[in-house]
Amino acid sequence: MYTFKSIHVNIQNATALVEAGASLGQLYYKVAQNSHVHGVPGGICPSVGTGGHFGGGGYGNVMRKYGLAVDNIIDAKIVDVNGHILDRKSMGEDLFWAIRGGGGASFGVILSWTMKLVEVPPVVTVFRLNRTLEQGGSDLVYKWQHVAPNLHRDIFIRLQIEVRQKTVRVSFVCEFLGRVDRLLSLMEKSFPELGLTKSDCFELPWVNSTLFFAEYPIGTVAEALLYESSRPAESYFKGKSDYVQKVISKEGLQSVWKKFIESEVIIMEWNPYGGRMWDIPASATPFPHRTGNLFQIQYMITWYQDGEDAINHNFNILRSMYKIMTPFVSKSPRQAYLNYRDRDIGANPSNGTINVDAARIYGAKFFRENFDKLVQVKTKVDPENFFRYEQSIPPHKY
């Protein structure tokens, strides 16, 4: 799919048709070339491909106002098991539902997506405030849990948490769909403890805010979105995910920080819900993580050494942190985000055997009650299970 990179933007209809091999950065750049008041409800990593990102849900900085990428997909093209190219009308609503959050690779080969563009102001405001535990960071995180899901829908404040100089550093990273003065007024009412000032903030076009969240310096040209990847080719990466439905107590946070400091190399990102994410029913798409979730957690670890020992060492560090978080996250099942592929939560046997019972172990975590409908769609469109992988959706006969 790497060569399928065409992007067609129709500002009159406020839509974009993007082929599955195009990256998010390429899509953001193309939209910005056509309009300064339209954006895309997608993620913050410019080099991520749109084909898989949209197929698994696709969340980003405007999800509290506009929902996920899949909530804004209005058409798609897919190659089915018979080699036919289908659009929304010819594939039918059940298959169209399944590929928007259920992972397109279980059902066929996604060629392209058509999505609604969302309205953004000509100027947005961003900030990044860093606070250590010694600077009151833990109390701010506790407050953030109450505030962030209930802020004005134009405000998105994520937490990036890492270990620096033997302590926890929490970065409060914000995008606001508006000017700085309005943001300061809203923050003073809702989160004065953060101590935000005008000098902390930057006003810039929406497309440049995507570079800010990708950790490019302020002033970086929009063409940087077209770069293939900022990750060193020789690096290795493992990720996991969680959903939090109840505020973690101050005492609970202390236990999290203790283990986190011991790990040294893990990064956590906490992404707030609320707003539009609480409006959309869990069954609207296969992505079920909606009402009831305060925020989502992504755990990340990166290393640069080759070999099995390095893999096992870093996997064990991440798994240990994940275990410590068990009391604080969703249960029965412990939910996970499809796009953060994680074989630890279940996978089909290595001998190629696939069945519904085995798939339900991971499927319920990714899709909750939507798993059974995904199996029904799979049974209808791919009964012989031609499209399969370690965590795919199986048909009923298997």
Predicted regions and their residues:
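Soluble FAD-dependent oxygen oxidases
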Residues: 1-398
